[in-house]
Design a protein with these regions (language model features):
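Hydrophobic alpha-helical targeting segments used for export or membrane insertion
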Residues: 3-12
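N-terminal cap/lid segment of alpha/beta-hydrolase-fold proteins
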Residues: 16-32
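Active-site/substrate-binding loop(s) of hydrolase catalytic cores
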Residues: 27-28, 43-50, 57-181, 188, ...
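Short beta-strand-to-loop junctions in surface cap/lid or active-site-entrance loops
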Residues: 34-43
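His/Asp/Glu-rich mid-to-C-terminal helical/loop segments that flank catalytic regions of hydrolases
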Residues: 210-236
Length: 236
């Protein structure tokens, strides 16, 4: 299986330098987590988009799949993960396969919360879960200026601190409400924003249910529009 993954990755990279794909790790139950890379790999402008971290909040996958299928962008380096919590998606639960809320397991202001399978159980320790460690490695590797996390179901874009400027722009491009809300303990955006000053990691809360096609396209537009603003402005 490992050889097949390697060969498929090499084939993608060889056939089209603007598209590649690789498995960056495995979930707690052994499912592959894959990242797709689109656009200009030589560009210093990096954007990361994650479609699903809570397994029962999967509407964002439609946006990430749309981005992957679209013509690769020019002028920036786009990294896309459809699902960082494949076990939770398979089980249709918020938590990962070990009953941990991955978005309370990051090592930024982490505190012990709840018990296994509680909605916001933060795990036995920060970074206890393979999925959060995979994200940590990837973010350290590519150091994206913008990271967008899709959630549900609040129908708004939320951010705090240094990420609020970029998040407001996304909200405008996507025609959504924006709210300044402090990050809970142990979240992915809070970790990145503290670990990499000057970057912008924020959350897009989609509506309940699946996204209609025109909204999928609108969110994909918001991603690329925000990235292009990044190309011409040091402060997004």
């Amino acid at each position: 299986m490992g050889i097949e993954i390697l060969l498929s990755t090499l084939a993608l990279a060889t056939s089209d330098p603007t598209r590649s794909s690789e498995v960056v790790g495995y979930s707690s139950q052994g499912r592959a987590i894959r990242v797709h890379r689109l656009g200009d790999p030589a560009s210093p402008k990096k954007v990361l988009v994650v479609g699903c971290i809570h397994g029962n909040e999967s509407a964002g996958i439609a946006v990430t799949r749309y981005l992957i299928r679209s013509t690769p962008p020019t002028g920036f380096d786009l990294w896309v993960i459809n699902v960082v919590n494949p076990d939770g998606r398979r089980l249709h639960v918020r938590q990962n396969g070990r009953g941990v809320d991955l978005n309370r397991n990051f090592g930024s202001e982490w505190i012990p919360i709840g018990a296994r399978w509680d909605p916001e159980y933060s795990g036995p320790s920060p970074w206890s879960e393979p999925e959060t460690r995979i994200v940590r490695r990837l973010v350290k590797r590519i150091q994206p200026q913008i990271t967008i996390w899709y959630h549900q179901p609040q129908k708004l874009v939320r951010a705090w601190g240094q990420s609020s400027h970029a998040a407001r722009k996304y909200a405008r491009y996507a025609r959504m409400a924006f709210r300044l809300i402090r990050w809970p303990h142990g979240t992915a955006p809070n970790w990145q924003n503290h670990r990499f000053p000057g970057t912008s990691s924020f959350v897009v809360e989609l509506a309940p249910g699946s996204l209609p096609e025109h909204r999928v396209a609108r969110h994909a537009y918001a991603v690329t529009k925000l990235a292009r603003v990044l190309m011409v402005s040091a402060r997004v």
